[in-house]
Amino acid sequence: MTSVEPNVYDPQQVESAAQQYWDATRAFEVDEASDKPKYYCLSMLPYPSGALHMGHVRNYTIGDVISRYKRMTGHNVLQPMGWDAFGLPAENAAIKNKTAPAAWTYKNIDHMRTQLKSLGYAIDWSREFATCRPDYYVHEQRMFTRLMRKGLAYRRNAVVNWDPVDQTVLANEQVIDGRGWRSGALVEKREIPQWFLRITDYAQELLDGLDELDGWPESVKTMQRNWIGRSEGLEIQFDVRDVDGGVLDPLRVFTTRPDTVMGVTFVSIAAEHPLALHAAKNNPELAALLADLKQGGVSEAELETQEKRGMDTGLRAIHPVTGEQVPVWVANFVLMGYGTGAVMAVPGHDQRDNEVANKYGLPIVQVIALKDPRSEEERSWDATRWQDWYSDKSRAFELVNSAEFDGLDFQGAFEALAERFERKAQGQRRVNYRLRDWGVSRQRYWGCPIPVIYCAKCGAVPVPEEQLPVVLPEDVAFAGTGSPIKTDPEWRKTTCPECGGAAERETDTFDTFMESSWYYARYTSPGARDAVDKRGNYWLPVDQYIGGIEHAILHLMYFRFYHKLLRDARMVDSNEPARNLLCQGMVIAETYYRPNPDGSRDWINPADVDVQRDERGRITGATLIADGQPVVVGGTEKMSKSKNNGVDPQAMVGKYGADTVRLFSMFAAPPEQSLEWNEAGVDGMARFLRRLWAQVQKHAADGAAPALDVAVLDASQKALRRKTHETIGKVGDDYGRRHSFNTAIAAVMELMNALAKFDDGSDQGRAVRQEALQAIVLLLNPITPHASHTLWQVLGHGETLLEDQPFPQADAAALVRDALTLAVQVNGKLRGTIEVAADAPREQVEALALAEPNAAKFMEGLTVRKIIIVPGKIVNIVVA
C-alpha cells in the first residue's frame, strides 16, 4: 500500500499517493495492441488562458467519469489532452504584460497542466500537444496547400472591420458601439483579400450527415440545419439601366418567394456592390453615404438590428415580368458577402423592406391575400401596419394584383414563374445555402502562418511540402499595432518556388478554428509523418465528445467539415468525427455588488462575502467580510470575470480535495443542465466522503470478513444484499446509458444510509457489509478515484489500478424478494398495505387484502365485484 495514514481521511495525502501510483505505472497510456473494444472519449481542448475555471472542471470530470467507467467495463480507453494555444487573447495579454504571446502561452500551459493533474484525470499525457508548435501546425499547412491545388482553397476580397488607429483588423466582438475596443476609433469596413475554404461544396453532405448522428442532441443538429440553411428558390435576372439610360450589367437575385415578384417596387444592393460604386462616381451624396456605411461592424447580427438606411442610386432595374423600371437602392442591411449582394424588395410582404419603404416613401403593393383569415384584422391589409401573415407562406393564400398569376397559391405561382423565367432565360431554379465559405485568413500575428508565397510573375503559389512548416517566429516584440511578421522583411521576403524570382510570404495567419477542427485526429497518431496514420482508423470516430452547446455552429461545423477533408485525402475512413455528443450546462454562481454613483457596479467575489440564509437555505442578506457592510445580491449567473463570481478550482481542491470537488460537480445537476455552485453543497460532499472513509476503516478494523454464503442469510442480511445489487444495477445504467451521474451518486448515498443502519456483527453480517462496501468503492471509482484507490486496499486488496477491476454486476438472485409489501386499494384509493410471501398464491393475497383492517372499513355493507392484482405492487378491490 502507498503511504497513507488509514484512520484519518486526508485528501491531499490520499490523492498524492494515488497519483504517484498512476504516474509510476503509466496507468492511462494506451495503444492499439489490445483485444478489447476501443473507446475514444474526448472533451474539447482548453485554451491556455492562465488558470482552470469551474467550467473546465465540470467538462473534464464528465469525460473522466465516462472514461474510467468504460475502462472498468472492458474497453481500451483513450482520453487525451492538448492545448488550443493560438488566438487573440494571447496578443491582448502580451500587450498588457509587455511580453511575447508565446512566452505567456507556454507559461499558462505549464500552470494549467499542473492544475489538471491535481484533479486526477485519467489522461494519456504521452499524446499531449500545443497547437502553436510547428510539429502540429505543419500538418494543417500541408493540408491547405493540397486544398489549394484541388481548388478547395481560394482567395477573394472580403469586407472586414478595420481599426484606422491601430492599423489592424478587428474581430466582430472587438467592435463596441462601432468603435475599436482598444483605440476607441470609429471602425471602418474595408475590403481586403482573404483566403477561403469551400465548405459550401460540402453543404449538402453536411446537412444529410446530421440524420446519421443519432447520438447528437437534437438542439445541436437543428442549429446546424438552420446554419446550413438549405432553401429552394429561383435566381431571377433584373436588367439594369444607368442614369442616362445606358445598359449596365444585370443584377441576379435569389429568392425563396418568387410568388411575390409582382410586389417588387425596388431592388436593394450592398454598399460594396459594383453597381453602387459605379453610381457613386458622379453622385457626391451617394459617395458620402457609402463612406459612412463603411463605419461600424460587419457582423450579420449587427446589421440586422441597426436602423435601416438607404439611398436611391439613380440606377433603374427592369422588372422581369412587367418591364417597368424600379429604383435600385443602396441599403445598409444587404451584405456583399451573402448571395449576390442584391435582393429584390417586396415591401408588402417582407418586414425589413416594409420598414425601408415606409421610411423613404417607396411604393408598397399587396400581392397576397389570405384564403382563411382568422380575425377581422387579417381580412384587412395596411401597408403602414405590419402583420406577420404578410410574409407567412405556411398560411393558405392566393395571389392578387399579380396579372395572369392571380388566384395561384404558393406552389402554383412558383412553378408558373419558374417555367416563365427559364423559358425566357431570365432565371432558373436554384438550391441555395445560408452557409458561406469559411474565411480562414486573420490579419494577426499569433496564429499559424498561411503557407502561400506571392510572386509578381507566378501569382499566389503554395509553399512546397518539403519547405514546410512555415515557422512563426516566437521571440518578437509585440505592441499590438500590427503584426511583427508584416514588419519583418527577413521573414517576409523569400524566393518563388516556381520561377526562383523575388517573392513575399503571406503574412496573414489561419483562423484558430483551423487548429481545433482536426486536433481530435492528431491525438490518435502521435509522431506520425502526416496528420493521421493508420492508427486513426483504429480510434476514430470519437465515441464520446463533450463540450458546451455554444460550439454548436462554428467549431462543430468545421469539426465535421475537416473530417470530410481528411476522409477525401484518404487519411480516415469514417464520414463523421464523433458518434456521440454531450453538451454540458454552464456553471453558475451567486453574484454580489455595490452600486456606484454613476450607475456602474463593483462586482464582489463570493469568497469575499458573508451570506445569511434562512432555514430553507435561501439568501436573506449578505455583507462584505472586509467591512461588515451590506452588499446587493445580484442573483445567479454564469461564472465570469465580468461579474467576478468565479470560484477558483485550485482553492477548492486545496480546501476539500479533488475527489470532493469532482463529486460535487457530478452531483449538483445532470450534465446537460446548469450547475449552481454552492459551497455548502461542496461541504456536504466532503462529509459524505468522510463517512464512507470511517465506515470502511471501522469495518476493516474488525479483521478480514468471512466468505459470503448466500444460502444462510437471514432477512436483514438479504435486504442489505438486495439493496447493494439494486444499487449496482442502477448506477451501471446511470453511468453507461443515461450519463445521469447525479442519480448514480444519490443511489450510492441511499446504500450508504442502509449500511449505516445495518447493525449486524455476525460472520455473514460482516460478509454482506464487505460486499456492500466493495461495491460502493468500485461504483464511486469513476468519480472519486483517489479515495477509491486507497479504500480498496483498506478492504483487503493489494494496490492495483481499479480501472482494471471489472465494474460490479448485479446478481439477479440477490434481487429476488422473499416477502413483498403490496398496497391495498378500495375502488382505486389507497386504504392500507399487506405483507405477503413473494410466491404467495392469488387466493392468499386476496384473502389478506380483504382482511386488511382499514380497507375492511370501506367495504362494509358493499359487495365485492372484482379484485385486480398488479403483481408485486397493488391489490385493488372494486366494490359497489
Curated annotation (Swiss-Prot):
Q: Name one GO biological process term.
A: leucyl-tRNA aminoacylation
**What GO MF terms are annotated?**
aminoacyl-tRNA deacylase activity; ATP binding; leucine-tRNA ligase activity
Top EC class for this record: ligase
One GO CC term, this protein: cytosol
Q: Which domain of life is it from?
A: Bacteria
Q: Does the keyword Cytoplasm apply?
A: yes
Q: Where is this motif: 'KMSKS' region?
A: 638-642
Query: Which HAMAP family does UniProt cross-reference here?
Result: Leu_tRNA_synth_B (MF_00049_B)
Q: What is this protein called?
A: Leucine--tRNA ligase
